[in-house]
């Protein structure tokens, strides 16, 4: 629309100049006390009117005639066909300056238009009664911002630019997520699988290290990437690329920034919808509640839950078997009582002085079914070596002279100690009571 506007204005000025030059009646002007000068060509057209009956000086008529070829030269420069008039007008340096000033003049109106478009968009995507309500919008990225990148930020090697792809961690499950995501989007805002994968990965970031500003910067980078991909398509057409390169650099930067904001608005709308509907699009992890209501890092929370289950074979135990075994081995090795073994029968006898073992009670692990299962992290042989001496400390004292009179079942051997440990709870806390 801008190009058509400037074409119409330029053609009207040329046509009026031609009519004035070909007629006997001169153009009228209200001087307002301004004296004509020889360099009156630089005066703006805002002071000239095509209506009036006053007679003006001949030098003003000459001014109009001298201004006419100047406009004609600008308009007809490079024009071969009228269909290309819009492109030629944009190539004029003066037209480029005017176009650069237009965004500043219409900034207020543009903000109102953006606000109205945002309200209409939100109203359009508002769910119906049977759909869940929109969640917290505190993390939304503003859509009222106009992004302007410098020429240096637009410099890029188009040949090395990579297209949008689905991340490897989302392959195989991106289609149902994309379909659920598209159900909450406008008809003209349907996301692609690549866009869904990128936004999904953004919501998995740790927000303590990557606040909302990081999300905004990443969306700007994705929008810039989309513009450069479009520009690479234009580069494939040689004639179209030549026309693009003939434009003045300020005008090219303006066009790129306009396309950037179009891509950016799309990314922002998609991001806001996805983060609002995250629990409805991908769903929370089963039997797992994330602290502080944060559902943006469900994959990491699920991984942490799985890791904790692997660390402890019994969830109710505060420490795993490996760490308990190390502590017990260190303490019992230092306080192990001295033993004497009879080579004839293999029985173990201890001093008559009882050994204090109340300090070792908290370190004794409970021998349950899970302890004797194959899932135990500590080898069974090492447990026998560590527990054998301490368990034998609970055996009653037997006189070596009476060992021949005692039945063989009453002699506490290494085999009995291992059996005691393997039964896991049949014996009481003290072996002498069980015997």
Curated annotation (Swiss-Prot):
Residues of the signal peptide: 1-22
Annotated Polar residues bias: 342-354
Cell compartment(s), UniProt: Secreted; Host nucleus
Record flagged with keyword Secreted: yes
Record motif RxLR-dEER, residues: 48-65
Alphabetical keyword list: Host nucleus, Secreted, Signal, Virulence
Keyword match Signal: yes
Primary role: Secreted effector that acts as an elicitor that induces cell death in host plant cells.
UniProt domain comment: The RxLR-dEER motif acts to carry the protein into the host cell cytoplasm through binding to cell surface phosphatidylinositol-3-phosphate.
Name of the protein in question: Secreted RxLR effector protein 35
Source organism: Plasmopara viticola
């Amino acid at each position: 629309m801008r190009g058509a506007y400037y074409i119409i204005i330029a053609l009207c000025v040329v046509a009026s100049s031609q009519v004035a030059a070909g007629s006997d009646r001169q153009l009228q002007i209200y001087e307002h006390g301004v004296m004509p000068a020889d360099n009156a060509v630089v005066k703006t057209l805002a002071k000239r009117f095509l209506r009036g009956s006053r007679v003006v000086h001949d030098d003003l008529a000459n001014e109009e005639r001298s201004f006419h070829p100047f406009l004609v030269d600008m308009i007809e420069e490079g024009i071969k066909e009228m269909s290309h008039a819009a492109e030629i007008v944009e190539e004029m340096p003066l037209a480029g300056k005017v176009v650069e000033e237009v965004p500043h003049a219409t900034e207020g109106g543009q903000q109102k238009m953006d606000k109205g478009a945002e309200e209409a968009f939100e109203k359009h995507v508002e769910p119906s009664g049977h759909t869940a309500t929109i969640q917290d919008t505190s993390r939304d990225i503003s859509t009222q911002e106009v992004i302007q990148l410098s020429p240096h930020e637009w410099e890029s090697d188009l040949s090395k630019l990579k297209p949008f792809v689905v991340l490897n961690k989302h392959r195989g499950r991106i289609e149902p997520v994309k379909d659920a995501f598209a159900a909450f989007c406008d008809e003209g805002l349907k996301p692609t699988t690549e866009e869904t994968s990128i936004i999904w990965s953004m919501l998995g970031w740790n927000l303590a290290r990557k606040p909302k500003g990081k999300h905004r910067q990443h969306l700007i980078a994705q929008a810039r990437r989309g513009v450069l991909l479009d520009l690479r398509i234009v580069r494939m057409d040689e004639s179209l690329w030549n026309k693009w390169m003939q434009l003045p650099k300020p005008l090219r930067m303006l066009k790129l920034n306009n396309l950037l904001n179009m891509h950016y608005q799309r990314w922002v709308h998609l991001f806001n919808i996805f983060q609002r509907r995250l629990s409805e699009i991908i769903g929370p992890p089963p039997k797992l509640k994330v602290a502080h209501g944060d559902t943006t890092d469900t994959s990491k929370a699920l991984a942490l839950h799985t890791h904790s289950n692997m660390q402890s074979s019994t969830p109710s135990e505060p420490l795993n078997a490996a760490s308990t075994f190390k502590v017990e081995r260190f303490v019992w090795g230092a306080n192990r009582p001295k033993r004497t073994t009879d080579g004839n029968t293999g029985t173990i006898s201890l001093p008559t002085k009882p050994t204090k073992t109340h300090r070792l009670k908290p370190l004794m692990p409970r021998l349950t079914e899970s302890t004797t299962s194959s899932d135990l992290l500590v080898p069974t042989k090492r447990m026998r070596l560590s527990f054998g001496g301490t368990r034998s400390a609970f055996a009653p004292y037997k006189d070596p002279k009476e060992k021949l009179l005692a039945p063989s079942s009453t002699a506490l051997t290494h085999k009995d100690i291992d059996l005691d440990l393997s039964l896991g709870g049949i014996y009481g806390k003290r072996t002498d009571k069980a015997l």
